[in-house]
Amino acid sequence: MSGAAAHVPVLLDEVVAALDPQPGDVLVDATFGAGGYTRALLDSGATVHAFDRDPDAIAAGSQWPETKEEPPRLVLHPRRFSEMVHALAEAGVAQVDGVAMDIGVSSMQLDQAQRGFAFSADGPLDMRMSQHGPSAADFLNSAEAEEIADVLYQYGEERQSRRVARAIIAARPLETTGDLARVVRKALGYRVGAPKDPATRTFQAVRIHVNGELDELREGLHAAEHLLRSGGRLAVVSFHSLEDRIVKRFLQSASGKAGGTSRYLPQTDVSPAIFSDISKAIRPSEAEIARNPRARSSTLRHATRTDAPPRKEAA
């Protein structure tokens, strides 16, 4: 792979506008993936520290010419983005000018059947971003029905989680993404041509559980709070309500304001604001959705870091 990204990331123009990268800026792309955001940030003249726990993404990024400049303008970190404070400290970087996060599975991972993230093509039931630790098959073939049901309900918002869990138990062992998709479709009923495959929620839930994605997001947001300089910008793209809820609540809690007891009462200042200029939810245009259907469910929220000290949990 060259320096040109193989996949166009969602809300690219909006993310770049939110970060407003300038030559000489030091930025973090917390979710490198195929490198779409990183490419745009590098083109602005910035230096980018890019994180990804997927070794395939890191291997592809290592071929980019910016990694070979002296000093390099692209520094790759094969680790979780929740570790960005410690990783950048090791690289001699105490603060950065901007952080971009694109949460969840990457297009590159979805398009590789052997990674086991999607049911559009049959592949091993894996779903691990890092390719280390227990796989989706390990979890589904060993967990009790109650645990599986809880995961499906909490992370997939699957209302019929217990029915699906019982069907999974009855069909074990499951080895491929096709095995899991067929079990879920049979349990819930699948009409050809339905707008949404009933297996979607189960795949999302299992993937989030296997990779600890929501805890990673929470820790990553606090890491960004600690790392951003005063005036630095945070931009987070999420793809479902669970993620967006976490981002929204984080920014609300960092705004320094508490909501009134009534919608008719104003918010009141309760602590120093950690972030200001907090945006409302930004959605992709119809034109972008037409170009890239995966953008349909995406939401961007962005904010600017103040000079208030980070909260203890951000350290």
Swiss-Prot record:
Keywords: Cytoplasm, Methyltransferase, rRNA processing, S-adenosyl-L-methionine, Transferase
Keyword Methyltransferase (UniProt): yes
Main location: cytoplasm
Localization, UniProt: Cytoplasm
Record's GO cellular component terms: cytoplasm
InterPro entries documented for this protein: RsmH (IPR002903), SAM-dep_MeTrfase_MraW_recog (IPR023397), SAM-dependent_MTases_sf (IPR029063)
Family indicated by similarity: Belongs to the methyltransferase superfamily. RsmH family.
Protein name: Ribosomal RNA small subunit methyltransferase H
Organism listed in the record: Erythrobacter litoralis (strain HTCC2594)
Gene for this chain: rsmH
